[in-house]
A protein has these predicted regions:
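Cleavable N-terminal export/targeting peptides
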Residues: 1-47, 342-344
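Transmembrane beta-barrel domains of Gram-negative outer membranes and organellar outer membranes
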Residues: 37-245, 254-343
Length: 344
């Protein structure tokens, strides 16, 4: 077959140009993906006692449009180590908590939505102790004595004159199911304020540390808004009150009236990616002089969100106990969320 001189080089150039056009079209297509609205990171304090209480995670104040669904799946893995005591109390938390939660929201009517959350919990010795010890050693950080105890062992214990509890055997099952009703009562071009009423049912086994064994109720006020400047920032916050029910496992120890609050900032640095920083805090779950159960908790979270497809996003985040011992040493979290584009 006869080929004109220079034809091969021309064909290669045409093929290269075609490939470049395809790549450019693919990248442009990614940039054109419709993305959904901003949302705080899903954060729960999974400390063995605080995790039993029905404290709600932050969510945006925007309400799901009438007739629409928002669906999310959240996964968390928390590692605990606290060993503390005084003349009248002794506390030991050593283990890991795994939690997977299905979250469903449904738009009941204009400015009203209903949210259902169904969690599955696992309490065990886990597998992260060695990794965390190596991390502390690498950075020369204090480990609070965790390297001197056996690794990957489950041992939750508390004892005082007022009561005691313990868990040494691995457990896993459904946790406490929660239901909440939210109403947006203020809205303008850049912000929304909503109120929520929530109820946590004592469906988890309290003796296995899968729930409190009691019903809790809360009220929350939430806001969401865009930064009033050219910066691509969104802000979210919540403040609320929870009334805890009578828990058999915490009998004689628990605090019944708990406040909670949180603030999140979402920086959308590209159309399909954002970085989120978040603070969450709540009142101590027990009447105790020991920080691990009697101190007000402060958690800090840093995460990233990828809007990988129309109406879909995935979050990856790490939670640290800013106030040491009031939350797990570290919690690794991931969420996948579907939210209709009309959801804001």
């Amino acid at each position: 077959m006869f080929i004109l001189p220079g034809c091969k080089s021309v064909c290669r150039a045409l093929q290269k140009a075609h490939a470049q056009r395809l790549l450019a079209g693919f990248v442009a297509g990614l940039g054109a993906l419709p993305t959904v609205g901003s949302e705080p990171l899903y954060v729960k304090n999974l400390s063995p006692v605080a995790g039993l209480i029905g404290l709600p995670s932050q969510r945006d104040a925007q309400i799901t449009p009438s007739g629409d669904w928002v669906v999310a799946l959240h996964g968390s893995l928390a590692n605990h180590y606290v060993n503390d005591g005084n003349a009248t109390e002794a506390l030991n938390f050593d283990g890991e908590t795994g939690r997977v939660a299905l979250e469903l929201r449904y738009g009941l009517a204009e400015n009203w939505d209903l949210q259902l959350e169904v969690p599955w919990l696992d309490q065990s010795g886990g597998d992260l102790d060695g990794l965390i010890d190596d991390w502390h050693d690498f950075w020369g950080m204090s480990d609070g004595g965790r390297s001197s105890v056996p690794k990957d062992v489950l041992d939750y214990r508390y004892a005082s004159a007022q009561g005691d509890f313990s868990l040494q055997d691995d457990t896993s099952a459904i946790g406490d199911v929660s239901l909440s009703l939210s109403h947006a009562f203020y809205r303008d071009e850049n912000s929304t304020v909503s109120a929520a009423l929530g109820y946590k049912f004592g469906t988890g086994d309290d003796k296995d540390f899968l729930g409190s064994g009691a019903d809790d109720a809360y009220i929350a006020l939430r806001f969401s808004g865009e930064q009033l400047s050219d910066l691509p920032l969104s802000w979210h916050g919540q403040v609320g009150y929870l009334r805890a029910g009578d828990s058999d496992v915490l009998d004689g120890l628990q605090e019944k009236n708990l406040w909670f609050a949180g603030l999140a900032m979402d920086w959308r640095f590209t159309r399909n990616w954002s970085v989120i920083g978040q603070i969450d805090s709540h009142a101590a779950p027990l009447d105790s002089e020991l920080t691990g159960v009697g101190g007000d908790a402060i958690l800090g979270t840093l995460g990233t969100r990828w809007y990988f497809a129309p109406q879909w996003s995935v979050d990856i985040s790490v939670v640290e106990d800013i106030r040491v011992e009031t939350a797990p040493d570290v919690t690794f979290q991931a969420s996948v969320r579907y939210r209709p584009a009309s959801g804001g």
